């Protein structure tokens, strides 16, 4: 709050009022007594001053030629518009322009619902009710459109301030501006709504923390992938599925980290590339999670867990299923964003000039991301429950009969796998389920703070998976054996190379020596010929 107050108080002491309470009087009628007529509002001489600067944003002051400004907001409520009336902001020129190709109708006069001190709400003429300022508080503005989402509901007050309903944030008049908006491309008229800044708040802070947590997590996922690829005993069906799952998470995390930490231009092609890449690999990862759940259930479906297909064919089928469905989701999302005229609140939002990732402020995230993941989590839960029931049934059956040693060992092995991947499911399923809940209550700042911990845990999944799948006793033993075998193999190869080199040297030497015929080689009878090595 102190920083926001700073925006309202800092200014030149030689001017009659703060810049944000002024309007530019250049070109307006001046009276002999020094007062000015500003669109029918008389600005007294004592509230007129010469300014040699402007504020191009809330934080940036620019020196300009001296010009006259009047403190009209000192005696009349002001309302800020982002661009002069009938002009729109153009990102290519980074300024306001008159768009002659735009055929939409501007409201004349613009009517706004204003809430007064007595809590009454009245539809008023914007130009009659307020003195109009034109100022863009920050480079990136986000318009509120209550027609598309109740999270965009707001209240405009008679003093020119605004209440953002979803988080009950009171926004001062110079921290937002009114902008012409439309819902559908086919709309032929503008509606005037406020646009607010992407201010640094608790939510953006959490995004930064999550990004660094993901960076911390990525090396652990890569280590887990390396361990499961390099150790033959771990390259079974479940191990290969885990590797594919981690590949999806690693690429997805890397893409999101780059977007969040390096501030990728939301209007550029790189934004779309990172956004769609992250989406594809995240969806692929969750399809592999469903594969793991299905394969565990499949192994317990029969009393002896007999596989129907050879492991290689089954892995190929699983790969086509997981990555294939991820491609289908990617195509569906891309078409919805790039090739349709859907309303903005039904588009994914990837690379739309505002977001590189999905738009989390409306139902788009539910349709294209959280919805499919919710289905996967529910399906995984059902399969895990069915597998647990089957394990319990097999245990009871084996307790009633004399089980063979192999059957008991196989059951124990499958139980270990089930327990391991059950913990993986708990890490992934429950964490993402809490994130789904946080998505629904995210507009309520009081509730959403409860999910900051789950968001952080979600971002640190790589570390948790590394501890679960690599730091277990059996895997560490396999790593030790693998390192020992590699070291022994290296020593053995070195020894063989040394032996061959020595043999070759002696052989070469014998070619240059004259054979001794006077003194033939004699082996002493005291030496066992079977244990004697002879180099000629």
Curated annotation (Swiss-Prot):
Covalent S-S links between cysteines: 17-71, 73-78, 82-177, 83-96, 138-197
Topology of the protein relative to the lipid bilayer: Multi-pass membrane protein
Location in or out of the cell: Cell membrane
Domain of life: Eukaryota
Pfam family, one: 7tm_2
Function noted in UniProt: Involved in biological aging and stress response. Essential for adult survival.
Quaternary structure and interacting proteins, as annotated: Homodimer.
Designated name of the protein: G-protein coupled receptor Mth2
Species in which this protein is naturally found: Drosophila yakuba (Fruit fly)
Gene that encodes it: mth2
């Amino acid at each position: 709050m102190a920083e926001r107050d700073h925006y309202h108080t800092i200014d030149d002491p030689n001017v009659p009022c703060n810049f944000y309470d002024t309007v530019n009087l250049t070109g307006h009628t001046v009276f002999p007594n020094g007062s000015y007529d500003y669109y029918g509002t008389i600005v007294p001489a004592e509230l007129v001053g010469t300014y040699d600067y402007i504020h191009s944003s809330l934080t940036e002051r620019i020196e300009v030629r001296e010009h006259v400004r009047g403190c009209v907001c000192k005696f009349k409520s002001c309302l800020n518009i982002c661009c002069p009336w009938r002009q729109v902001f153009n990102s290519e020129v980074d300024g306001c322009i008159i768009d002659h190709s735009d055929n939409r109708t501007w409201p004349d006069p613009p009517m706004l619902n204003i809430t007064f001190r007595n809590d009454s709400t009245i539809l008023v003429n914007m130009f009659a009710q307020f003195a109009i300022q034109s100022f863009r508080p920050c480079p990136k503005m986000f318009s509120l459109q209550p027609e598309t989402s109740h999270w965009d509901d707001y209240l405009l007050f008679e003093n020119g301030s605004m209440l953002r309903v979803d988080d009950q944030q009171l926004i001062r008049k110079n921290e937002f501006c009114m902008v012409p908006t439309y819902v559908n491309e086919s709309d032929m008229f503008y509606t005037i709504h406020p646009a607010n800044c992407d201010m640094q708040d608790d939510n953006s802070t959490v995004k930064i923390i999550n990004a660094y947590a993901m960076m911390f997590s990525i090396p652990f996922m890569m280590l887990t992938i390396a361990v499961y690829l390099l150790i033959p005993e771990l390259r079974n069906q479940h191990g290969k599925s885990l590797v594919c799952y981690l590949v999806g998470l690693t690429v997805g995390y890397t893409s999101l980290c780059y977007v969040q930490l390096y501030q990728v231009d939301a209007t550029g092609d790189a934004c779309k590339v990172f956004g769609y890449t992250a989406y594809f690999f995240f969806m692929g990862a969750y399809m592999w999670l469903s594969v793991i759940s299905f394969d565990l259930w499949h192994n317990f479906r029969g009393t002896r867990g007999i596989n129907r297909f050879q492991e290689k064919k089954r892995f190929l089928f699983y790969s086509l299923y997981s990555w294939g469905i991820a491609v289908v989701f990617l195509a569906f999302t891309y078409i919805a964003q790039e090739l349709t005229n859907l309303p903005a609140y039904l588009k994914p939002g990837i690379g739309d000039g505002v977001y590189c990732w999905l738009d989390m402020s409306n139902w788009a995230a539910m349709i294209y991301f959280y919805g499919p993941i919710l289905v996967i989590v529910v399906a995984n839960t059902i399969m895990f429950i069915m597998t647990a029931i089957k394990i319990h049934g097999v245990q009871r059956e084996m307790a009633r009969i004399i089980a063979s040693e192999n059957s008991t060992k196989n059951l124990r092995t499958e139980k270990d796998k089930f327990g391991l991947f059950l913990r993986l499911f708990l890490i992934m399923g429950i964490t993402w389920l809490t994130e789904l809940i946080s998505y629904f209550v995210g507009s309520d700042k009081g509730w959403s703070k409860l999910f900051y911990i789950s968001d952080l845990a979600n971002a640190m999944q790589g570390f948790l998976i590394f501890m679960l799948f690599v730091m277990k006793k059996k895997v560490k033993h396999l790593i030790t054996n693998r390192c020992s075998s590699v070291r022994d193999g290296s020593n053995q190869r070195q020894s063989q190379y040394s032996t061959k080199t020595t043999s070759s040297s002696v052989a070469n030497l014998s070619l240059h020596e004259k054979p001794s015929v006077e003194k033939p080689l004699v082996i002493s009878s005291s030496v066992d010929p079977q244990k004697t090595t002879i180099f000629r």
